Regions:
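Nucleotide-activated sugar donor-binding and catalytic core shared by glycosyltransferases
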Residues: 1-237
């Protein structure tokens, strides 16, 4: 709960003899921090020391259709590697993507786990698995997070705590953390396909931009931590 939530609830309850509503915050920030602490320390590589890997996370068809052509063109002029995870991985989508990338001379491999992902040299790695994004964010340099061109952008807290600059579509404003990520320049929202590759250049070609966005992303999560403790303290008081 933030100050705006507090005001709304207070106005609703002002006739019910309730005069004090403490602000505890959002326990989800604590949860994502706790999950990140379980990550092996050796896997927590500084953003500028990571390989040039772009993670396309929770990709909806609307995201794919919006940016795929520009991504292929961009990859032909760079050396970055792409990890691609569909929102709902399935063999039909994997085959479509694999054929398309291969036709454009971009070597592609489909894997069912991330156990050996660091040993794969293919330009495109299509990951046919779920529940692996939290780990992958710690080894990627930039992430595109899907959903922003359809139902709403997916979880941004996991890439943020890993210090990964994010790019996502325009439907994000109902998520307060997403609004803060944009306002603090920890990530960028796009509405046109050309903006996608422009921001890839912005991050991959500038250590300063990458570092600033990475630090901003982590600070957003850390600055909102402590909600769980506040709730427990209030319940025990």
């Amino acid at each position: 709960m933030d100050e705006n939530d507090q005001k709304d609830i207070f106005n609703y309850l002002k006739n019910k003899s309730i005069s004090e509503i403490p602000i505890a915050g959002n326990p989800r920030f604590d949860q994502v921090i706790q999950m990140s602490r379980k990550q092996h320390e050796l896997d927590k590589i500084d953003i500028n020391k990571r390989e040039d890997i772009l993670l396309m996370a929770s990709m909806h068809k609307e995201d794919r259709n919006m940016i795929l052509a520009h991504l292929i063109k961009y990859l032909k002029n760079t050396d970055i590697q792409v990890y691609w995870i569909s929102h709902e991985p399935n063999s039909q989508e994997n085959k479509y993507l694999s054929n398309l990338f291969n036709r454009n001379s971009l070597s592609t491999e489909v894997v069912n786990s991330i156990e050996r992902i660091g040993q794969i040299d293919s330009r495109i790695v299509i990951i046919n698995a779920v529940g692996v994004l939290a780990d992958l964010y710690w080894i990627t340099k930039v992430a595109y997070v899907g959903g922003g061109f359809s139902s709403g952008v997916h979880n941004l807290m996991e890439p943020a705590v890993a210090g990964v600059p994010m790019i996502f579509g325009p439907r994000y404003e109902k998520f307060k953390e997403a609004v803060e990520i944009v306002s603090q320049n920890a990530g960028r929202s796009i509405s046109k396909s050309i903006d996608f590759t422009n921001f890839l250049d912005f991050y991959f070609n500038s250590k300063e931009n990458l570092t600033h966005s990475s630090e901003s992303a982590r600070n957003i999560i850390l600055n909102h931590s402590g909600a769980s403790a506040k709730i427990l303290n209030h319940l025990n008081s």
